[in-house]
């Protein structure tokens, strides 16, 4: 009954917080409690529970450690076990369940339960009961049910049981206990929770110390109705609110329940909550079952300390008093180890409640951890979309409650992950993004999304796809994109003028008066025109198929063909977010969208037609709106046609520095123009399709154009400039591979290639700046090593090098050697005269070994020298990383060698030192006997001594072992310091003392560079007696090991001295005291409150020495000239025996020649006459014969000495191993260099070779086949130990070698430019003549044709002239290219071979015959081709021999075009013999109509020049009256034509196959070249031109479009006029019969 009554008590008494009255609340009935519990049941995520259940089944193992789930991973295959499918109608396995989990198909745990039940029932139905599968199914099903019940039905029953336990045990400790005793118990329980850690040392209670922020976690307070934390519990303990342990247990239960309700099962917080609850009840049981008889002081100290940790320093200070209690000290030390783990709770208590914290949240900014998310609110509104998108990514958690974005908070460590910064060129982290948000650097959400995507792409690029980081990236990208769409939809709702939802919105808002708003309003109007367009009759919206891009799943090929997809959604989004800098940007995107539709879909399809109609409507509407008021560019139609349209919409205002550089490179190549203003990049913008040029894709395996490069650039696929340059170089290489060396496109590719490299060089600056300066690095390493050794100190702070300063500079055993001391070495180091580590080591060891030779083994100098040598070796190995950084011969001398040398040296010196000590002791003994004899004689005279241990003088007692001041011999000296060893009184009653005298530093002989401890004195070898009356006072001398830690009582600091060494006046040397043997003093020593710092001061002679240095400055100035040269290591000639050597030759491995040391394996520059750069030779043999030195070895050549394509790129300073191996005299050597393999070039350098003389070689050049092939490496040599090896420095990070263009590139460009300049020069002469007489003759007027002709503007390719003018032929012959084709010889060969092939294959078409003729020409021998070329020499240039009668139209493509109004060429008079009636080629006037072709991709118009045949004997009229003999004069006055055509430019053949393509268009059954019947049937309204076709129209023929609407209309009008004039000529000159 009592138990039930306790359960009926309201729980509000422990959770409401109202405990001040000290009474229990009124009880409430039981049902209300149950209703409250039901309302607060945990809201568990079913998907998380399903994952936990699946993982439990998957990870369960039996007693043998086998996974039981392996039997059910996959269902049996129907082929192997067909009977399984007879028994089981619905097969399922764990793989299917896992797939459903990934697809989140389980919305409820019951669905997963049904699948698992089906899985195990299938197994039980098929397998026998004694089979392993059947037993495993039973076990796993039982495990599944138990686990499911724990997750789903965990809430009420467990809490009820816990409450019963707590209530039953409530009275065990509370009854009869005082409030103070209960408080101590509660504090112990709280302490157990607060200090509990997991095995890794993490505090379990960390997340439970404070409630989560209401700002950052508002949903927590919506779910949790009774929030509580450890801070609240600590306050209630301090306030005495808990009347029993059960009351605190209720709050702990509530704390755990809240955590498990809000967090997912399996999360870390969920587990920590269970741990806290378990710890509490374990501690509670421990207290209940043990007698509470421990020391109250210990309990109080421990428990109050825990409470003080939680509640701040203001509570229970008395319990932590200053008394030295061991128990208190124990707990204080225990807490000191824990540090400040509970500082967060203490801070929370000091600064008030949670609401106060939220109010002050704007001032709190934390850089790391969870607090970082809160700091965003201090500078940004929570409703800000930027903050929402950032916070969504940053605070996203997985099912275990872990922050998914945690690895992205900061960038990886450069020390731990150096390769990350090699692969990732633009690293970025959430912290950097947060900083940009804080500084408001993001203009739009797209900019923020761009940075987040960059961060994710970096992670995906660095990590493997199966890694955990990679999976986190995918999840975060999904979350980010979903949030971005949500924010976009929210903008749609907030934006009242959404263009898609309300397409008919008012376009004339009077509120938007600014220029920006007017521009945006115009874009909306144009957008709405496309949006509202409908098909007449059906009412179908034409834009429906353009709203969103096609699905990648349904149309995968679309994204292979269309590199830059675009849809109306994107355009609308860009308009709304002001991404377009102007109206042109939106128009470019619209045109791109329509162009994509026409490119992907077939002509005549619905989408194709809709794109054309919508584009026309858009242009018409834009024309209707007119130009912007302040847009001056719209005034001139000519300017509008010629200028670049708009700013690229993809070029955002916000670009990273790398994106800006990439854009600059791209724009530099794209916008480059030649001297005539022609843009060279036009033909490289887009490749022809496979249907247009199939053979291109057969020849070129990796096609590339500038549109693809631009799309890669906009998609952030280029991590650095080199990646983009590689694609550009590939594109130019493709152009040079496919096209002829004489073609214009070949020349344009070379020029743009040069522009590309120049632009990259300008952007990146000095390309070699990233190569480390090895000389400086070696000197820095030597400097660091020297400073480390010279500043090496012992435990007392004494520098070991101080004692070595007294070493003489010259070794007495070798007086002829140059002097060498540490001071000289220091000057060499400061002057950077060491280039080798082994030389520096030799000098250092020479000084140290001299110190060892000249001093005893037990002396301080000897020991310091050994210590410094050991320290040198250790620091040297650390700096060189045992050869990983610097590989030097110096590393061969190790500590083991040093120990052997020292031991050997000691064995030699110790016998001598023992003999010296013996002699010294005998001498001291004799001196002592003499002194005793003298004192004995004095004693016989009547003096008698009475010895004592102490004596008094002037009211002071002096004891043996005391230190005293003794009156100095001279008045101006300091008192002497003496240690009393004996005291006596003579017979006269006078008191005496005898002892050891201590010297101050100024009383010793030492170098001015020596430093001393403050208050240091030295124990001397001088002992003497002094009358006690000479004592001036007491002092204390302490040993160095005690001086800094202890201090004497009742002594002033100035009377306390420190002694570290003894001083010998005979040898004037110092030696450290190892054992303090002075008499025991009666002075008492106590520990110092603060240990004294070890401070060393300079000698008193240092100032005087400075004066001497100043006097010697003049002498040092004289020696400065010596500092300019480098110190060289001593070397010697190393002869070697050569078994197969020639007689009279003396061979060497190392030889000195002209002050240059050379060894086998070295590379040298050798004199090379007639070359730009000297060649490089490698020494493989060295010999001297008759006093002259020679070497033999292979020769390396430079790229300009090889044959290669001009577009080939080489590494800077790259050379090639040739087939040449020569013997050269040493006199031809210009200097040393180093040729490294590719691997070594990236990673290391020899230290004595300048960087400019370091060369790279990875390929061998074969002269016979002109091929470059990589080889393994150069031959290595094994030399004797006398040969000095090179020191090699290895870079910490491999360098990236830069490439440079071929040296032939510039020469080839200059040659082609000169050739084309000569061709264009001929045109200029004709143009000048044409300008003088530009009038043309008007033919008789005839009625205009009513039926317009359709020209084939987009079908007929341009075939430029084939013949080379005389002025250019000379240079063309010099250019020996294997791909050069002389088309005149080919024409002659074709005229002969065509008849032969025609006879063999009468059924072949004209195009097939032409292909066979071309194949035969390619396979023809060179000699035969030369014969045809010679045969063509007899014909006039440009005219093929005709084999038969000519009928119809004859192509004059091989002739030079002539400017209208200009005279005919001198080699073609108006009547050419053999070609009756053919007018001069190239005449373009109203009498001759050229056949218009497709303009070149470069933008220049081109056409196939044709003439019209007249009757035999009749000549065509000249273009203007002149002194030409042919033809009757024309009396009519010429009039100015309506359209004036500019002179056609001479252009080279772009592709050799273009000629064949033209021939294929001919037909044997037709009497004409063009399809004139189709041309006459074409009408303007029936022909729809695409944007590409319009761009290729020869619009520059006309000055302006005149009165016509578009330029196309004007050209249609020109076509009608030309057809009419053609008919007029035909009728006027009676050409009907031709």
From Swiss-Prot:
It is found in: Nucleus. Its main location: nucleus. Residues 956-1074, 1156-1272 form the BAH domain. The keyword Transferase does not apply. GO terms for molecular function: chromatin binding; DNA binding. There is a cross-link at residues 96, 154, 210, 425, 471, 511, 591, 638, 653, 1106, 1111, 1167, 1293, 1308, 1398, 1587, 1599, 1601 (Glycyl lysine isopeptide (Lys-Gly) (interchain with G-Cter in SUMO2)). Residues 157-167 have a biased composition (Acidic residues). GO terms for biological process: blastocyst formation; blood vessel remodeling; cardiac vascular smooth muscle cell development; chromatin remodeling; epicardium-derived cardiac endothelial cell differentiation; heart development; heart morphogenesis; negative regulation of cell population proliferation. The modification Phosphotyrosine is found at residues 134, 1289. Component of the SWI/SNF-B (PBAF) chromatin remodeling complex, at least composed of SMARCA4/BRG1, SMARCB1/BAF47/SNF5, ACTL6A/BAF53A or ACTL6B/BAF53B, SMARCE1/BAF57, SMARCD1/BAF60A, SMARCD2/BAF60B, perhaps SMARCD3/BAF60C, SMARCC1/BAF155, SMARCC2/BAF170, PBRM1/BAF180, ARID2/BAF200 and actin. Interacts with PHF10/BAF45A. Interacts with acetylated 'Lys-14' of histone H3 (H3K14ac), and may also interact with other acetylated or methylated Lys residues on histone H3. This is Protein polybromo-1. The gene is Pbrm1.
